[in-house]
Amino acid sequence: MAKKEVKKIVLAYSGGLDTSIILKWLKNEYGCEVITFSADLGQGDELTPIRDKAFATGADKVYIDDLREEFVRDFVFPMFRANAIYEGHYLLGTSIARPLIAKRQMEIAKIEGADAVSHGATGKGNDQVRFELGYYHFNPAITVIAPWRDWKLNSRQALINYAKKNDIPIPVTKKRPWSSDRNLLHISFEGAILEDTWAEAPENMYVLTKSPEKAPNKPQYVEIEFRNGNAVAVDGEAMSPAQLLAHLNFIGGEHGIGRVDLLENRSVGMKSRGVYETPGGTILREAHMAVEQITMDREVMHLRDSLIPRYAEMVYNGYWFSPEREMLQTMIDESQKTVNGVARVKLYKGHCRTVGRKSETDSLFNLDFATFEKDQVYNQKDAEGFIKLNSLRLRIRSLMQAAKKK
């Protein structure tokens, strides 16, 4: 769609450097109505000045929607039922937020009769893919405006200069020059000193977690209850999904839990360094797997575990609304019907470790079967035939190799 044909744009607006300038740029370049949408996913004080800032920068209308409960209930929890983790370290805090933002942005576009949507993701990153796959899922004909792929402001310094020229306040200082993205699941950091892959992230970068060295010298034990694979209570106190994750963030943060420094493979093909704080999510995943250990059938667990990397890639690459992710989710949710119980974890100086698990209704652990002291329900001699059958292919292979050497 040509610029002159665009009548109304809904912009995913964070109030940060990129989207603040994009808002002004859209007004100047398209000369049409621009509506900003900001999702409250647990950013805290970051949202306080957004409404005034958006109007001051040229917004015609401003949406700020509290999506915290929906975020955790319908996006984070389903992902954690799958134990999803990308490349062994990343708990997908940014990745899982983008589908919800895209969903609500498209709902607003429909309500407002907008013919275009816009975002602040760069042309080198993952978020452009995540946003736009979501947009096209809800409206295949929507016009997407991605300024980073169109304008000539192709460096952070150029953006800062543009902002100064247009009197746009920006939250970037020499003391905190890196970019960040925060929600209830995590906070991520990129750029600046982190572009040197050998340099350690400075301690003043971290927001959610204490330094493990300065964390309490006494460990804290936390009990988390699960029903159908979802956390429902902490230390016996029932909480909503968003309340529960926020509570675990605070507890985990006090003990320095959930720091990750990762050089990850982006969906567009390049490598990128990110530093993440995911205190509550780290605790939640550890506890969830502990309850699974006592309630989930072995073959079901192994099959599900084999699919974790694929599921995580779908989330990371922006395919949350894809049929393949929905198919996997159905299978995973079926496996979670028996994941009912309580896990006890120990938090101490950056470490989260399971120290106990139990299930009153769905435990598959039977002491009579597992003990090494009794043979009432398990005849140890039966193991001989089991071993011989399972070793058959190995024995045949050895015999054939020996025959070749003769």
From Swiss-Prot:
ATP binds at A12, Y13, S14, G15, G16, L17, D18, T19, S20, A39, G120. SUPFAM superfamilies: Adenine nucleotide alpha hydrolases-like, Argininosuccinate synthetase, C-terminal domain. The keyword Cell division does not apply. L-aspartate binds at T122, N126, D127. One of its GO terms (cellular component) is cytoplasm. Keywords: Amino-acid biosynthesis, Arginine biosynthesis, ATP-binding, Cytoplasm, Ligase, Nucleotide-binding. It is found in: Cytoplasm. One of its GO terms (biological process) is argininosuccinate metabolic process. It holds the Pfam family Arginosuc_syn_C. GO terms for molecular function: argininosuccinate synthase activity; ATP binding. L-citrulline binds at Y90, S95, N126, R130, S179, S188, E264, Y276. NCBIfam families: argG (TIGR00032), PRK00509.1 (NF001770). PANTHER family: ARGININOSUCCINATE SYNTHASE. Homotetramer. This is Argininosuccinate synthase. It comes from Geotalea uraniireducens (strain Rf4) (Geobacter uraniireducens). The lineage of its organism: Bacteria, Pseudomonadati, Thermodesulfobacteriota, Desulfuromonadia, Geobacterales.
